[in-house]
Design a protein with these regions (language model features):
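Alpha-helix C-terminal capping segments
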Residues: 1, 156-158, 218-221
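Amphipathic alpha-helical segments of the small helical/lid subdomains adjacent to P-loop NTPase cores
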Residues: 1-14
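Amphipathic coiled-coil/heptad-repeat helices and related helical stalk/stem segments
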Residues: 2, 92, 149, 182, ...
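Alpha-helix capping and helix-coil boundary motifs
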Residues: 2-5, 22-27, 206-207
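Accessory nucleic acid-recognition modules appended to NTPase machines
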Residues: 19-196
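Short conserved micro-motifs at the rims of enzyme active sites and ligand-binding pockets
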Residues: 137-139, 200-201, 210-211
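Active-site ExK catalytic segment of metal-dependent nucleases
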Residues: 191, 195-207
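Catalytic cores of nucleic-acid endonucleases
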Residues: 203-221
Length: 221
């Protein structure tokens, strides 16, 4: 069924070789081996990385937080506060560049829709294959909402769209009459030539409240 196909894709990704394997064990083994013995080994060899603990931990953090706003500075702070490791901004940035150059992850930059300019930081990082992402964290943290967002991003990139993360601000008043500025996120601002689309990604719309929540930022554009 279509739902079964979607579930399979969200779990094992879209690499063609996956179709050669019939059992879950075979698919998991293939993805883990490909990630560790091909992608990561190539990165370590190509960039002569000898002390690889920080690289490995960075991959885990990004894989565990797909679709979350972050930056090299924020990641460096995470290493200092949670991992007790003083990894510099430059090292984090270099490692992320290595992952991007190896087609493991891709960065989506924030774009101020009303101001018509890019926002320097933070960004979002998406895995270019969900199966590799899931294999990296041992198929834990399979929240459908985040996986669907990553899937939609990948599909838009496959269709040659340039994809940014939208930010839209508005000014309103609270119950006391005070002016308040709020910022809402548009999941994707997609551009291809003269075409532009604004997209919200949601795995489920279980209620009218959820629908209104997803529409709120679009209605402010």
């Amino acid at each position: 069924t279509m739902q079964a196909g979607l579930n399979e894709y969200l779990l094992y990704g879209g690499l063609p070789q996956i179709l050669m394997y019939n059992t879950e064990e075979q698919k998991v083994r293939f993805l883990k081996t490909l990630f560790d013995e091909t992608y990561i080994k190539d990165i370590k060899d190509r960039y002569n990385i000898r002390k690889d603990d920080d690289l490995e931990e960075l991959i885990n953090i990004i894989a565990s937080n797909i679709g979350a706003l972050t930056s090299p500075n924020k990641l460096a702070n995470t290493f200092r506060s949670e991992k007790k490791s003083a990894v510099s901004y430059d090292t984090i940035k270099n490692y992320i560049d290595f992952l991007s150059d190896s087609f493991l992850v891709e960065k989506a930059t924030r774009y101020d829709i009303k101001g018509k300019h890019y926002i320097d930081s933070p960004f979002k990082y998406y895995f270019m294959d969900l199966g590799l992402r899931n294999a990296r964290i041992n198929f834990r943290q399979n929240e459908r909402t985040h996986l669907m967002e990553n899937l939609v991003y990948n599909e838009l990139r496959t269709r040659s769209f340039n994809v940014d993360v939208g930010s839209v601000s508005s000014v309103g008043t609270n119950s006391e009459g005070k002016r308040l500025r709020s910022t809402l996120e548009v999941d994707f601002v997609c551009n291809l030539g003269s075409r532009r689309y604004y997209i919200q990604s949601a795995y489920r719309m279980p209620s009218e409240e959820k629908l209104e929540q997803e529409r709120a930022s679009l209605l402010r554009i």
